[in-house]
Every structure is written in structure tokens, then in C-alpha cells.
Amino acid sequence: LYEYNYSHDKYGGFLMLCPGPGATVNNIARYTLSINDGRYDGAPMIRMGTGKYGSIGVQVYNNTMYWEGTGYSDSLTPDSYWEGPVIEDVKVFNNIFYGPAASGSVSTKDGIDYYNNLVYSSNGSAQEVYKAAANDQSAVYEDPMFTDVTDVTTGTWENGKTTLGTADGFKIQKDSPAIDAGAE
């Protein structure tokens, strides 16, 4: 279970599931804010390793993934082939994906279901890529209307004391199209 996290500027993407020596089974990633992850190597937001045993029963929901473009990830949810093609019962739903995307960056592999995600980029690339690949009949393709993405502070560690940062700018406005758009 990976939940209630705030990650930013990581080399890799938001989530990487690595099967081996057995399958990754019944993993859940939820309630997380990811800002500019995949920044340095263009890693995908979500990478599901297939492997010999695969990723089975994975749920990725109610997360916000935001990235700004050049030099950052341009891949939403690809899978990676390691020894075999096993991906079963993977659900990606009720997420906000905000940032540009490249062609082929959404996995269309059998066993992955996408639904009720909000997908947006100001240049329209994320919407185009997702529409062409995800088969998400309930997707929303509008700006989620964050209050102010520059209103983010980092935490500190000084003299043995931790001060948490905030990401208040990623709250959505009261008339956001994301409100009531998710599956129950």
C-alpha cells in the first residue's frame, strides 16, 4: 500500500512495480500527489513490470500526477517487458494526469483497465494520446483547475526538527470538472 504521499522531482516516475522473483500482487497506490517526477530520465509516471510472473491485481486511484514538459516524463502508464507478458486485473482510475504526453505512452496491454481519469495538458498532447489508447469512456479532458500550482513549499529538517511543506496550490477549485467525475 502506497498512500498519502507527496513526491517531487524524482529521477524515476511516480510508481514503479517490479516483479521478481515473484509477481507484484494486489498493490494499491492512492491519495498521492506527484509533481515533476521522472524529471531527469523521462521515466514514465507509472511503470508496471510484466516479468515472468507479472503485475496482478494492481489498483492506482485518486492520485494527482503533474509534470511540466521538456525534460520531464512524457509517458503516462507504459508497461515494461521483463522475461514475459503477464499483466492481469490492473485498474487505473479516478486519477488526474496533467502534463504533455508522447505517442505510445499509454499501455494498451490486455489486463489494464482505465476509467474515470482526468487527463489534460495545455498543448492537448495528453488528451490526444490518452483518447487514442486508453478506451476510457468516462474520461474527462478538461483543465482540473488547480488553485495555483506555484503555491508549493518544501519541507525542512533543521536541528533535529522536521517541518512539513505544503502543496496547497494543487487543491482544485470549487467548479473543477474533477468534482464528482470519479467512479465510486
Model-derived features with residue positions:
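Flexible loop/turn segments at secondary-structure boundaries
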Residues: 10-11, 179
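Active-site and glycan-interaction determinants of carbohydrate-active enzymes
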Residues: 162-184
